[in-house]
């Protein structure tokens, strides 16, 4: 019987067909030697007697019967052809193992060397199969874990380059990449996690932090990595917010400083020229500023006049009132004692430092004796018009105290009173006690001085000879003597 449809002829004699004689020959007792068995087998018909276990033979019979039932081999074989006896073995089953080389001492080769091995069965190897993983995603213990080579990582790098915006492969993509690169699933996941870390450290991160998906459970290393990425992103946002807040605070501080400077400029610019020039300093001939000395009050000693920038007019009035009240009597006593001892004039005028728009300091003596209206406003020279007619009429009467009071160049205290009355219109300065004190001071000044200063000496000592009026020509005087005396008195310190 031949089967040309399978591509090769089949012999009509079945391979497993064994007669009773041949079976009995194979199942002979073990007393016969190997050479005798071989001789008996060669004398008879060649018998194919492969050594199989009963389990394999039963399976083979089942397959043959099913194939015969399907009609592959035509009619099924009957028991007359000897198929009923090929499974039934005798009690001496060890006869099949009598052909071993270990039984015969003179056996030179294996008895199975001439039997061809069937090609239908191959051992199942996980590494050679298409899908190497079981349903839990793990490898079989027999397969070895391979290291990642340059060829395998090039495939992963290509996939990562194509998915730079979302470098998170799914489970199916990881399995596909693992099959292509012949790596394990854990190796692929770890490689992608490390690649994302490298890109993040190199500031080449072009993807937003990925949130956890509830429907897909990723490996532990991916979840841990994503948690780290989320924490890093949160820290970065917090740092950026702190930086922006600090920058805003610095900008606000700078803006406040600039606004303060602008307000200061506007305050200075709004001050008019008609305001009182109240801080003064004395300008003697040598042109140096004089410091205040020889004052009775302790707080007047070694005080240099400075201009305060942030004081108000009310504070100036209070300070001036206190200074005038406390200093008139003491200054008068100082002038009288000094004049009686050394014959030199000493003047002490106490004037506190007051606000002024210009940083120039003037002395009270220069202000009281100067009549230049271009240098001082008209409000500071209010009583000059009232005192000039009296000074012109006082040329005939020298001994009267009224004429002496009206003469501005004789008494600095009188000039101080006139100037203060012109600037500060306060009823306090018109009090009887203050007027009496000023009158007594003027009389004592006129009596102790002994001589009067003419216009030339006064002009040389003060610096304004053209505006001096009302001098008495009837009384002789010594110009050099008076000039020297006034210089000595002027060299002393005026306290204000």
Curated annotation (Swiss-Prot):
Specify where the region named Disordered lies, as residue ranges: 203-246
Q: Where is the composition biased (Acidic residues)?
A: 221-232
Q: Which tissues express it?
A: Expressed in the neural plate in overlapping patterns with other irx members, which all share an anterior border of expression. At stage 20, expressed in a subset of cells in the developing hindbrain with expression appearing above the otic vesicle by stage 26. Expression in retina cells begins at stage 28, continuing at later stages and is limited to a subset of retinal cells of the optic cup. Also expressed in the ventricle of the heart from stage 36 (late tailbud) onwards. Only expressed in the pronephros at tadpole stage.
GO terms of biological process kind? brain development; cell development; dorsal/ventral pattern formation; heart development; neuron differentiation; proximal/distal pattern formation; regulation of transcription by RNA polymerase II
Where is it mostly found?
nucleus
One function term, GO molecular function aspect: DNA-binding transcription factor activity, RNA polymerase II-specific
Tell me which CDD domains the record gives.
Answer: homeodomain
Q: Which family does it belong to?
A: Belongs to the TALE/IRO homeobox family.
Q: Spell out the protein name for this chain.
A: Iroquois-class homeodomain protein irx-4-A
Gene encoding this chain? irx4-a
């Amino acid at each position: 019987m031949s089967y040309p449809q399978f591509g090769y002829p089949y012999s009509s004699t079945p391979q497993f067909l064994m007669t009773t004689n041949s079976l009995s020959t194979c199942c002979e007792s073990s007393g016969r030697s190997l050479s005798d068995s071989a001789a008996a087998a060669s004398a008879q018909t060649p018998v194919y007697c492969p050594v199989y276990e009963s389990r394999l033979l039963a399976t083979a019979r089942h397959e043959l019967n099913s194939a015969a039932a399907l009609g592959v081999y035509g009619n099924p074989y009957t028991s007359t052809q000897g198929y009923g006896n090929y499974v039934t073995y005798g009690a001496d089953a060890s006869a099949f193992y009598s052909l071993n080389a270990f039984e015969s001492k003179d056996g030179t080769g294996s008895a199975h060397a001439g039997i061809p091995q069937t090609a239908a069965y191959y051992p199942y190897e996980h590494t050679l199969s298409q899908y190497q993983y079981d349903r839990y995603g793990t490898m079989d213990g027999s397969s070895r874990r391979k290291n990642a080579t340059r060829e395998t990582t090039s495939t992963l790098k290509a996939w990562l380059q194509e998915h730079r915006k979302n470098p998170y492969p799914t489970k199916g993509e990881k399995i596909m990449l693992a099959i292509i690169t012949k790596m394990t699933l854990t190796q692929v996941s770890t490689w992608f996690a490390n690649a994302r870390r490298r890109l993040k450290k190199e500031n080449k991160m072009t993807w937003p932090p990925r949130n956890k998906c509830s429907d897909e459970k990723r490996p532990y290393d991916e979840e841990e990595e994503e948690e780290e990425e989320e924490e890093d992103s949160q820290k970065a946002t917090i740092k950026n917010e702190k930086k922006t807040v600090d920058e805003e605070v610095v900008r606000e501080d700078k803006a406040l400083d600039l606004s303060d400077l602008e307000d200061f400029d506007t305050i200075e610019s709004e001050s008019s020229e008609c305001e009182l020039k109240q801080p003064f300093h004395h300008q003697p001939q040598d042109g140096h500023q004089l410091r205040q000395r020889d004052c009775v009050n302790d707080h007047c000693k070694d005080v240099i006049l400075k201009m305060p920038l942030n004081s108000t007019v009310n504070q100036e009035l209070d300070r001036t009132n206190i200074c005038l009240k406390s200093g008139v009597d003491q200054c008068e006593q100082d002038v009288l004692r000094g004049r009686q001892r050394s014959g030199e004039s000493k003047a002490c005028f106490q004037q506190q430092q007051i606000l002024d728009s210009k940083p120039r300091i003037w002395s009270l003596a220069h202000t009281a004796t100067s009549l230049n209206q271009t240098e001082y406003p008209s409000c500071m020279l209010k009583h000059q018009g009232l005192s000039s007619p009296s000074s012109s009429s006082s040329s005939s009467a020298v001994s009267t105290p009224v004429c002496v009071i009206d003469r501005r160049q004789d008494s600095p205290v009188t000039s101080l009173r006139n100037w203060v009355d012109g600037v500060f219109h306060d009823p306090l300065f018109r009090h009887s006690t203050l007027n009496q004190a000023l009158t007594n001071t003027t009389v004592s000044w006129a009596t102790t001085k002994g001589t009067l200063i003419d216009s030339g000496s006064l002009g040389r000592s003060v610096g304004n000879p053209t505006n001096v009026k009302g001098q008495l020509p009837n009384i002789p005087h010594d110009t050099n003597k008076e000039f020297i005396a006034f210089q000595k008195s002027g060299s002393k310190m005026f306290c204000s």
